[in-house]
Amino acid sequence: MNEKNEVVGFDPAIGTEIAKRMGLKTEIIITTWDGITGGLLASKYDAVVGSMSITAERDEVIDFVGPYYNTKRAIFTKAGSDVTTVAQLADGKVGVTLGETHEQWARDQGYDINTYKGLPELLLELENGRVEAIVNDSIPVMLAMKAGQYDLAVVNDPTAEPIGAGIAIREGNPDLAAAMQKALDDMMADGTYLAIANEWVGGDIR
């Protein structure tokens, strides 16, 4: 949020630009991650531009436009933490967002986890020492660090692979999907996407 109480950032900027190119007015709705797909399916909003990883499981119930950027799983600790390797996560409390792919990954590793509704809570719990590490998509956390909000360290995870983040829409809307994809493709071709990425992320993340 900015000083005018407006929702700002990379995702809002991308969504707003796509809507503008489609001749639509943007209404940004903030919701918790654990209910974000349900809200889409209940028609509370028409698209989710919220760093949602494209997975086969999600693709069974929703459609995706994009990907509009690529990220990967990343593990963060407070700067100066004794936790510096993935192996050490087994000995501490790990924070994840409820319903994200990283929650299942952490459970599969057998970690002692706490689940939260979204990144703001994750970062706050890490800052307050209630978890030793958090697992999240790399880009959103890097954005928070770039804004100077948090002093964090990255734990090297050699098994992490790139993940495409897509714009989620309800199934059965081929015209909407095509129009959004065209707007996104045009943004990437004419330099608008890169300008937005440079402003909010500091580089090209396609």
Set out the residue ranges of the language-model regions:
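Short helix-initiation/N-cap motifs at beta->coil->alpha
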Residues: 12, 27-38, 81, 98-100, ...
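Extended ligand-binding regions for polar small-molecule ligands
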Residues: 12-21, 87-88, 93, 98-101, ...
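Ligand-binding cleft/hinge of the Venus flytrap
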Residues: 1-4, 15-25, 86, 99-119, ...
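A ligand-binding cleft/hinge motif common to bilobed small-molecule-binding domains
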Residues: 35, 52-60, 123, 132-161
